[in-house]
Regions:
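N-proximal low-complexity "stem/linker" segments adjacent to membrane-targeting elements
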Residues: 1-27
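Short, acidic, metal-binding catalytic loop of nucleotide-sugar glycosyltransferases
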Residues: 25-35
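A conserved acidic beta->alpha catalytic loop
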Residues: 42-51, 94
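Acidic donor-binding/catalytic loop of UDP-sugar-dependent glycosyltransferases
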Residues: 48, 97-109
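Glycine-rich, basic loop-to-helix element that forms the pyrophosphate-binding segment
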Residues: 69-85
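Short aromatic/hydrophobic "clamp" motif used to bind/position activated sugar donors
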Residues: 90
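Conserved donor NDP-sugar-binding/catalytic core segment of glycosyltransferases
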Residues: 104-131
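Conserved nucleotide-sugar donor-binding catalytic segment
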Residues: 138-216
């Protein structure tokens, strides 16, 4: 990858059904903005998943970088991806979610003079679970899942991601956003170009507890 790559897309994967991972990868590859690298961090998947990921990475070697390490969790995997990225901007996609084809170009248009943006999502709930969760800061208030802060809703300049590492544990994404707000120009935007599939088995994000989702 050349140093002038515009966007680094990071994806941490751990034993998610490869059909979902393939959907996520394909949604990145078909972006209408093509100056990106996709860094897949394999967080210790099974042999079957590892082989599938390697085959895909080899097929698209001009776009995909594959990194593997023993199971460390999503936060540490994303941190490693940040260290290996060369893009001017960084964003994240979960292995069972997907982008609309204009996601990267929309984020680039929106960020303008900001240093980090957090976008709304288009949430697809795969069970009969509710679309609403309690606000961590006000438990009497319900917020829509589309409004919550997730790894994949963050898009920003590399210096923001290099300044703060993600902390392991629940709500690492929201915690990162709150810390970034103290030092950088941050804005929430209404894009809905990130498709969040909720309640997919074995997703790294599937264990996020509702009480840790917050609205900022």
């Amino acid at each position: 990858m050349l140093n002038q790559t515009k966007v680094s897309v990071l994806m941490a994967v751990y034993n998610t059904d490869f059909s979902y991972v393939k959907r996520a990868i394909d949604s990145v590859l078909i972006q209408d903005f093509q100056d990106f690298e996709l860094i897949i961090i394999d967080d210790g998947s099974t042999v079957t998943n590892r082989e599938s990921l390697l085959q895909y990475a080899e097929k698209y070697e001009n776009k995909i970088i594959y990194i593997r390490h023993s199971n460390r969790g999503q936060a540490e995997s994303i941190n490693r991806g940040i260290l290996n990225s060369v893009g001017e901007f960084i964003t994240i996609i979960d292995g069972d979610d997907e982008y609309k084809s204009n996601h990267l170009s929309s984020c680039l248009r929106e960020i303008k003079e900001e240093e980090l943006i957090c976008s709304t999502t288009e949430t697809i709930v795969d069970t009969n679970d509710d679309f609403f969760v309690p606000d961590k800061n006000d438990l009497t208030k319900l917020i829509h899942l589309d409004e919550t802060i997730l790894f994949g809703t963050l898009f920003g300049r590399k210096k923001v991601f290099s300044s703060f590492s993600f902390k392991s544990g629940f709500a690492a994404d929201a915690d990162f956003y709150e810390r970034a707000k103290t030092q950088f120009r941050v804005k929430k935007v209404d894009l809905r170009t990130y498709i969040y599939h909720r309640n997919i088995p074995n997703s790294i994000c599937s264990t996020i507890k509702k009480e840790n989702l917050i609205n900022s």
